[in-house]
């Protein structure tokens, strides 16, 4: 075993010879004491959790860590295949409930919950352990699959989707935390790409698998969701077994003690610990965040509703209230929250601020054009379910490939900003190319595929480089909070993008269809074309009705790309702010090298 991990026997004796366990993690204790204001400190529970993670990391052998990383890859492969499959099913599930235009609203709510669930997941991982939190996330995901499969209306489907998103987010976040626990900063760019590797294959397999389920039929899309409730728990067993075994090994060696194990405490103490945990989750902050952003974004995503004086007043009141709630959130979290849900003070660091601005605008731009892209391809271009998804997935494939490449480039040159300086112009040029060449009257897919590849390459270089930028200025104790803040900005950006997409799609597509088809079809049939993708596809290509539908879909999707281009220009603001921090194994004061026997 390497010197980085230290001798197990030496650690065992050291822990036994000291009555106070926390003395073994003096750097973390010193950081806590010198943190300054109380709401900028690392909590006692989190401090103990980080100490526990480091103690467990010291027990990894070469064999056990290989098993863990293989298990991590297997879980990532199954998760990515599921995502690529169910993405195509989603628009048919909503169409089954006559709510195809609600796609953006569902993604909007999902992105808001994405931003919120990360903080509790990180806190749970710090307090209770990586293994326990991974099991919780897995359980939520499985329950989400089953709820989606058996949903009876769009409301039940949305609630089930939220549960599913929470679980999937937990799995992804905990995978990154496990990698961070067992790697140095210099190697983390490469290792962080492990969960992304499966996308190189699943982007091609998923759409074909989705087509095989026949999602246009009611039972087809339900089966496509439900089957994963059995697959995912099975493939997660190697990773979970490896984590629990090494946790047991560390505890048996006396490398840590669980001061906050609820089983060993009386009822009053359990209640006190539950209150402490709730306080650390910043429950009030979460309520303010969810209510504020939901009230702000939902009116925009439903802009197709009939405008009346009453609805206008209600919308203005809703937006005003949401802004007040968000201002209150910022003031409360900065001034009064003992352990704020979002580490807003970290934004004082220009590298973290710039990375957050960059990832916010990137995800906003992406979600603006991507929400309805495959629907547009199926209608206007006449592509099948699998071919439309495969066309979009060339973006995902190129993004994943360049993200992996960026890890090796950061390892080779020890820099991340040069990659950001290349990625942002590349992505913007890709979006511009889609507008100029990708969407054409001849419905050729080759130009669209080429410019999607260019945009995806820019996105891949950007996402991982910006994430490493945040980690490069974060200590181990602050890593989870700062990473959560960064990912929150990505989710909020996605929520804004979905809100804009939903509003533009609902308002402009519905008005175009009504204006162009009112002399050919009754209003209820026009509404059905708008709400149900299957109705739009039921009209044969080449007929007058289908041509009108195609023109309306094309014009609306092109509008979304124009807005996406404008949003992407703001990425340059974040790029300018970020410092060029050199990467090395010393950046991270508690980084741990991969062990070897």
Curated annotation (Swiss-Prot):
Asked if the Swiss-Prot or TrEMBL record annotates the protein with the keyword Electron transport, the reply is no
Q: How is the protein disposed in the membrane?
A: Multi-pass membrane protein
Q: Main localization of the protein?
A: membrane
**In which family does this protein belong, per the annotation?**
Belongs to the major facilitator superfamily.
Q: Which PROSITE patterns match?
A: MFS
GO CC, alphabetical: fungal-type vacuole membrane; plasma membrane
User: Which GO BP annotation is one of this protein's?
Assistant: transmembrane transport
Q: Does the keyword Phosphoprotein apply?
A: yes
Primary role: Involved in the transport of siderophore iron and so has a role in iron homeostasis.
Transmembrane regions: 65-85, 97-117, 131-151, 159-179, 190-210, 225-245, 281-301, 312-332, 357-377, 390-410, 419-439, 448-468, 485-505, 558-578
Q: Where in the cell is it found?
A: Membrane
Extent of the signal sequence: none
Q: Which InterPro entries would you find in this protein's record? A: MFS, MFS_dom, MFS_trans_sf
Q: Which UniProt keywords apply?
A: Ion transport, Iron, Iron transport, Membrane, Phosphoprotein, Transmembrane, Transmembrane helix, Transport
- UniProt name for this protein: Siderophore iron transporter 2
Query: GO terms for molecular function, please?
Result: siderophore-iron transmembrane transporter activity
Q: Which residues carry this modification: Phosphoserine?
A: 46
């Amino acid at each position: 075993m390497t010197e980085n991990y230290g001798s197990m026997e030496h650690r065992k004796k050291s822990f036994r010879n000291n009555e106070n366990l926390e003395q073994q993690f003096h750097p973390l204790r010193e950081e806590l004491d010198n943190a300054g204001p109380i709401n900028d400190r690392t909590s006692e529970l989190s401090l103990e959790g980080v100490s526990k993670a480091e103690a467990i990391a010291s027990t990894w052998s070469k064999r056990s860590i290989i098993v863990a990383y293989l298990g991590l890859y297997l879980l990532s492969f199954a998760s990515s295949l599921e995502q690529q499959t169910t993405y195509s099913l989603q628009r048919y599930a909503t169409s089954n409930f006559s709510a195809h235009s609600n796609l953006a609203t569902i993604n909007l709510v999902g992105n808001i919950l994405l931003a919120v669930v990360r903080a509790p997941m990180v806190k749970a991982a710090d307090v209770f352990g990586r293994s326990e939190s991974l099991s919780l996330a897995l359980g939520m995901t499985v329950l989400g699959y089953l709820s989606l499969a058996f949903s009876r209306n769009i409301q039940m489907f949305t609630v089930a989707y939220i549960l599913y998103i929470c679980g999937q987010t937990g799995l992804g976040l905990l995978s990154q935390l496990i990698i961070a626990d067992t790697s140095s900063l210099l190697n983390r760019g490469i290792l962080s790409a492990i969960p992304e590797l499966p996308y190189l294959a699943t982007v091609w397999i998923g759409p074909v698998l989705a087509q095989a389920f026949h999602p246009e039929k009611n039972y087809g899309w339900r089966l496509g969701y439900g089957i994963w409730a059995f697959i995912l728990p099975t493939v997660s067993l190697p990773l979970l077994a490896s984590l629990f075994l090494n946790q047991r090994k560390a505890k048996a060696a006396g490398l840590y003690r669980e001061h906050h194990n609820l089983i060993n405490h009386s009822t009053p103490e359990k209640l006190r610990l539950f209150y402490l945990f709730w306080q650390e989750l910043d429950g009030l902050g979460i309520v303010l965040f969810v209510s504020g952003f939901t009230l702000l974004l939902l009116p925009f995503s439903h802009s197709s509703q009939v405008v009346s004086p009453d609805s206008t007043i209600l919308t203005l009141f809703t937006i005003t209230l949401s802004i007040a709630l968000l201002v209150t959130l910022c003031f409360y979290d900065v001034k009064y929250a003992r352990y704020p849900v979002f580490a807003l003070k970290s934004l004082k660091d220009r590298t973290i601020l710039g990375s957050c601005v960059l990832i916010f605008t990137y995800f906003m731009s992406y979600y603006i054009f991507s929400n309805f892209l495959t629907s547009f391809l199926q209608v206007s271009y006449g592509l099948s379910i699998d071919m439309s998804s495969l066309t979009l997935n060339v973006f995902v494939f190129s993004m994943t490939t360049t993200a992996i490449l960026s890890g090796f480039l950061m390892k080779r040159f020890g820099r991340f900003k040069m990659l950001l300086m290349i990625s942002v112009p590349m992505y913007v040029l890709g979006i511009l190319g889609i507008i100029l060449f990708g969407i054409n009257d001849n419905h050729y897919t080759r130009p669209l595929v080429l410019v999607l590849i260019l945009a995806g390459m820019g996105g891949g270089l950007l996402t991982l480089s910006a994430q490493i930028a945040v980690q490069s200025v974060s200590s181990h104790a602050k890593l989870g909070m700062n990473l959560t803040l960064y990912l929150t900005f990505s989710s909020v950006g996605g929520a804004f993008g979905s809100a804009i997409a939903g509003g533009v799609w609902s308002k402009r597509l519905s008005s175009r269809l009504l204006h162009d088809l009112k002399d050919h079809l009754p209003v209820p049939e026009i509404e059905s074309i708008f709400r149900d993708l299957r109705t739009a596809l039921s009209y044969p290509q080449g007929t007058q009705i289908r041509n009108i539908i195609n023109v309306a879909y094309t014009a609306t999707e092109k509008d979304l790309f124009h807005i996406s281009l404008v949003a992407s220009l703001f990425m340059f603001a974040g790029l300018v702010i970020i410092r060029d921090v050199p990467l090395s194994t010393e950046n991270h004061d508690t980084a741990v090298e991969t062990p070897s026997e």
